[in-house]
C-alpha cells in the first residue's frame, strides 16, 4: 500500500488586517493580558491564516518534497537532505499537494485530523479548488488516514494530549524542536523572510512523523 507522510506550516494574518467585527469576535472573551495570545492564535485557523509550507515524504522510497511560499523572491528549487524544496505561492502549494496525493492509498499525519487536514481543505475551497479526496475519513479506522496523535493516545484515552516533540523524545527519535525552531516561531521566521528555514523545518517535522510512524507500524499497528 503506497503511503505518504505530510505536515503543514501556517502563518496568520496581522490582527490589524481583520475587519472591525472580526476583531471584536476574537477579543470578545479575552482579558487584557490575553490579547497578545489572541493575535498569535490567528495562525491556527484557516479563516485567518495561510498555508506557507507543505512537506510530503513517500514512506516506501524515503524521498520527499516541500512546497513553500517565498513571496515571489524567486529562490529557485533546491535540495535539503532527501527533500526537493519548491518555492511557490499558496495556491500552487495546494495544487501540488492534491496532485501528489493522487499517487497514494494512505496518508500519515500527526494531529492531522484536528489541524492539517481541515486546514488544507478549507484553504483549497478559498481558492476554488476541487477537493479531490476526503482527508477526514472515518476516524476509528487506520486504513486510509493514520493520525498518530489518535493512534498513540488510543483515540484520546490518555489523560492529556502530547505534542510530537514529547513522543519523539520518549521513543528516542530526533525532534525537529532540537534545532531551536517550533511551529510557534514560523510566524516570525516568515516575517523575517527566512523562507528556506521554514521549508527545512517542515521537512524535519515530516521526517520525525515518518520515524514515529515506523515505530507504530512495528509495534502497535496490528493491534489497532
Question: Can you describe what each PLM-predicted range is?
Answer:
Residues 2, 49-52, 57-62, 67-83, ...:
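Metal-dependent phosphoesterase core characteristic of DEDDh/y 3'-5' exonuclease domains
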Residues 91-94, 126:
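Extended, compositionally biased low-complexity polar/Lys-Gly-rich tracts
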Residues 1-92, 99:
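Conserved RNase H-like, two-metal-ion catalytic cores of nucleic-acid enzymes
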